[in-house]
Amino acid sequence: MSQSVESRTRIKNERYESGVIPYAKMGYWDADYVIKDTDVLAMFRMTPQKGVDPVECAAAIAGESSTATWTVVWTDLLTACDLYRAKAYRVDPVPGATDQYFAYIAYELDLFEEGSLANLTASIIGNVFGFKAVNALRLEDMRLPIAYLKTFQGPATGVIVERERLDKYGRPLLGATVKPKLGLSGKNYGRVVYEGLKGGLDFLKDDENINSQPFMRWKERFLFGIEGVNRAAAAAGEVKGHYFNVTAGTMEDMYERAEFCKEIGSVICMIDLVIGYTAIQSMAIWARKNSMILHLHRAGNSTYSRQKTHGMNFRVICKWMRMAGVDHIHAGTVVGKLEGDPLMVKGFYNTLLETQTDVNLVQGLFFAQDWAALNKCMPVASGGIHCGQMHQLINYLGDDVVLQFGGGTIGHPDGIQAGATANRVALECMVVARNEGRDYVTEGPQILRNAAKSCGPLQTALDLWKDITFNYASTDTADFVETATANK
């Protein structure tokens, strides 16, 4: 029921009294708020300090991430402040936790500059995470309205065009990270690239921390690397690539490296998440103008995404990076050495690949999201995976993914080329089995053993790594579980 005119007038008068007024009474809490299609929505997991009411805590988060300060200021009257105040509109207890709550907050679209991740994040995560009223705070999910998404370019290339450029369909793409990360000379680096690609991989890649160090300057790496790409592509008759990391200390240096990457004929370049949101958007714009696939390594994300109660969930990073315009982003393996609950990872992949997602609490998706025709972003699975897990990887991750076997290629006893061949044969035999309608998940180990009878490198890899899997409990799991319901 709507408030009476007298009631609204009384509330408004109280709201502008001098001094400190609870955020909820200042207009940052509205349980009757009607969500607009143009609102930016955010859902926070909050742990209020002892004695702080959850509703007041949610209102404080809304206030401090929009227009509020600690006391009433008369200059509010010079603005459309009732419109611009963020509205906390719902607070739910977190299942299984006694001191945590989900706070839902709506933001007026005009609070954000068009096409600027830096501005969006300055509000949503800029100040509230240090707020004393909360013991811990985590941004779990966001709903970005179509009107706002249309101000971002989205992935520079997208999954469909990438496959067209590579002429590779119906299977995951295969890659590997050059190992060791640091210390190789340019010539030896190029040899690793050549061996891996000639053995059957689609891509080799730089790791996150190889830039331009004294043991190998960037131009040396690029020149030897592209030689390896070209020789392997000519030998295999396939389009091949190497992710040249153009990350540097300044945008000027990054543009210089990216331009050189284009000049030598590379189809793809790479940046790290740590360069920052504005730099990522700038490189994505450059990549689109120059028809370059842009790979993003999520270096640094676990410093704020891994813990359950404070920071932000990686699904939010997935959304922001799709908006920013990267074509690839590392998004988890489930079975590898890095953090990744199966349901959470599925939610990440759906966020990157679907044109529209519905609410799916078991995957951690708290809002429905229409992606406004932005291109799809290719997830990358890397970190502790090997060919013996191929049936699991395809089952969990599907076709639209780059499977990066670093140690699982370069650690092969018979050499890099043999490691690449083992991975390619494992992938091909599993895709064939799936396409034939076989239960490849259950039969996976036997399918691999059968293929290994005519592929020595695969047999050696299976003998070496067997069924190694990093079975550690995930620190970030779903708060909701699926329950069986009777059909009526």
UniProtKB/Swiss-Prot annotation:
**Any one Gene Ontology BP term:** reductive pentose-phosphate cycle
- What superkingdom heads the lineage? Eukaryota
**EC annotation?**
4.1.1.39
Sorted alphabetically, which keywords does the UniProt record give? Answer: Calvin cycle, Carbon dioxide fixation, Chloroplast, Lyase, Magnesium, Metal-binding, Monooxygenase, Oxidoreductase, Photorespiration, Photosynthesis, Plastid
Q: Does the keyword Membrane apply?
A: no
Needed co-factor(s): Mg(2+)
The active-site annotation reads K179 (proton acceptor), H297 (proton acceptor)
Binding of Mg(2+), residues? K205, D207, E208
Known InterPro entries for this protein?
RuBisCO, RuBisCo_large_chain_AS, RuBisCO_lsu_C, RuBisCO_lsu_C_sf, RuBisCO_lsu_fd_N, RuBisCO_lsu_N_sf, RuBisCO_lsuI
Q: GO cellular component annotations, sorted alphabetically?
A: chloroplast
Output the Gene Ontology terms for molecular function.
magnesium ion binding; monooxygenase activity; ribulose-bisphosphate carboxylase activity
**SUPFAM superfamilies assigned to the protein according to its UniProt record, in alphabetical order:** RuBisCo, C-terminal domain (SSF51649), RuBisCO, large subunit, small (N-terminal) domain (SSF54966)
Annotated site location: Transition state stabilizer:
K337
Q: What is an example of a Pfam family matching this protein? A: RuBisCO_large
Q: Which residues carry this modification: N6-carboxylysine?
A: K205
The further comment given in this record reads: The basic functional RuBisCO is composed of a large chain homodimer in a 'head-to-tail' conformation. In form I RuBisCO this homodimer is arranged in a barrel-like tetramer with the small subunits forming a tetrameric 'cap' on each end of the 'barrel'.
The job of this chain, per UniProt, is described as: RuBisCO catalyzes two reactions: the carboxylation of D-ribulose 1,5-bisphosphate, the primary event in carbon dioxide fixation, as well as the oxidative fragmentation of the pentose substrate in the photorespiration process. Both reactions occur simultaneously and in competition at the same active site.
Entry similarity comment = Belongs to the RuBisCO large chain family. Type I subfamily.
The name under which this protein is listed is: Ribulose bisphosphate carboxylase large chain
Per the UniProt record, the source organism is Guillardia theta (Cryptophyte)
